[in-house]
């Protein structure tokens, strides 16, 4: 029994604590479950949101860069364009139909252009150049050099090239422009699309944008031959600049000054500041006119001091090259106003100051040579004592020498007479020329007086033309006077028919100095003073041609058209009268007069004589688009005040 009493409560008491222990265990187990599940979920959500934010920010940055990158690429897009590929001569021959005349597009300055279709169905223009001429080879190298550097929608791209050594042919392949060049479309075919003012104004803006792109490169590219025949039109009549045969990179001028050094005597030797012209990135091509003749190269000795104010050019002849001074160099630098002393008579012969004394040095030298050969009196006495026959021989020799001396004097006198006669004849010719010039000048003054009386306004360029010489290289700036045109009409009938006018607009360029009427005055000189302002001047002429629909020089044959023959001179006269609207092409449709007058004023600013006075192409483009305010025209283009009439003139 006691065992039963002890074992009986055990099953009764055991469940009670178990139940009590399990009741509070439920909430504790619930708390452990919440701490293990919710924190990882929150962390995962936060991480996902943060990663999503990062991806969105990266995508936004890439999208913004894509939108802002095209202008930067256009500014420096030279490496983007692929280099021209080489074609075989046979493939280009098949593409052009064996260069048939039916596919001929025109004649350029250095070759004939043919139309062709290469593999893939792409239409191209193939220019066949003559490799025998130096100008053709220069253009070929220029085109290939600039092909990979110029990448602009306003520049005609070069697709490829070909060089046939057997036939000595150089070929360039361009992208075909469907509407040809601006010269043909505007002045010959008279395309109806260009009769709309908006289309013509857009062509002017496209050309300005293309030139601005060339000038914005580093180093700047100078086209050198901007004219309508070098502007091509695509299917949408968008203008593109072509023909980089005369293009060049702008040269950088670096002044190198050397400190003065002391000579051995203690005197200061002045060094002349030299200007070194360098072209960056253009070492393989040399398009300047360099004189490499032996007469132009001379060695300057270290002992001769040259001052900056007194350097004169002396031509070095082969005879002079043989004689050198102690330092081993020929004397080739002289000072103005001071005669360089030398022991050699030939150096004095080259001096301009002592030309009249050349004969004296020659006579001294001849006399010294005769004295060397002439025997002395003692020799004559000894010879007479020895034998009489030898004395007779000596007398004969001396008589011959004296006769030779007299013959030289007679020749000198004859030369003097001939020279005097030539001088007299030269004086007569000069006098006749001066009389003829005076007569022409009087005729000009009468014509200008009649012109001023008709206009009622004075002309600045006419006054310059009357005071200046008529043989200036920039004669087209001042305009052709009526006397010149009348004289041309009397001499030839071709000038009346317009052959002279056509010569200024054809695409051929006979020289490496640009095209007449489009080249700037400083570009026509033989110095290397070439800058971007040369293209600005050419663009001014092209802008006047585009607005007026006339050539720079055009003569129809009527006497009333004489004053309008020179387009630049006529524009200046209209600016002084305040009638710029008269210059606009009368066949234009939808004309905006304010915009047309703006274009003419911009062209006049580009046609200023001094390069520093002309605006840059960036400013020109800003003026045309209205982004830059148009400056006032110079006083020579502004309308002149009315003439004051006195009482005596009224009576």
Curated annotation (Swiss-Prot):
Q: What are the recorded GO MF terms, alphabetically? A: ATP binding; protein serine kinase activity; protein serine/threonine kinase activity
Q: Which residues are glycosylated?
A: 32
Which residues participate directly in catalysis?
Answer: 225 (proton acceptor)
Keywords assigned by UniProt, alphabetized:
ATP-binding, Cell membrane, Glycoprotein, Kinase, Membrane, Nucleotide-binding, Receptor, Serine/threonine-protein kinase, Signal, Transferase, Transmembrane, Transmembrane helix
Signal sequence, start to end: 1-25
Residue ranges, annotated region (Disordered): 66-87
| GO CC terms, sorted | plasma membrane
Which ranges of this chain reside in the Cytoplasmic compartment per its record?
62-651
- Record domain Protein kinase: where: 99-633
Q: Which amino acid positions bind ATP, per UniProt?
A: 105-113, 127
Q: What is its main location?
A: membrane
> What does the UniProt entry say about where the protein is found?
Cell membrane
Q: Which EC class is the enzyme in?
A: transferase
Q: Its Enzyme Commission number?
A: 2.7.11.1
Q: Which residues lie on this side of the membrane: Extracellular?
A: 26-40
Q: Please name the Pfam families in this protein's record.
A: PK_Tyr_Ser-Thr, Pkinase
- Can you state which reaction this protein catalyses? L-seryl-[protein] + ATP = O-phospho-L-seryl-[protein] + ADP + H(+); L-threonyl-[protein] + ATP = O-phospho-L-threonyl-[protein] + ADP + H(+)
Where are the bilayer-spanning segments? 41-61
Q: Note the superkingdom of the native organism.
A: Eukaryota
**Annotated Low complexity bias:** 69-87
In the bilayer, the protein is annotated as: Single-pass type I membrane protein
* Classification via Gene3D superfamilies: Phosphorylase Kinase, domain 1, Transferase(Phosphotransferase) domain 1
**Family membership:** Belongs to the protein kinase superfamily. Ser/Thr protein kinase family.
In Swiss-Prot or TrEMBL terms, this protein is called: Receptor-like serine/threonine-protein kinase At4g25390
Taxonomic placement: Eukaryota, Viridiplantae, Streptophyta, Embryophyta, Tracheophyta
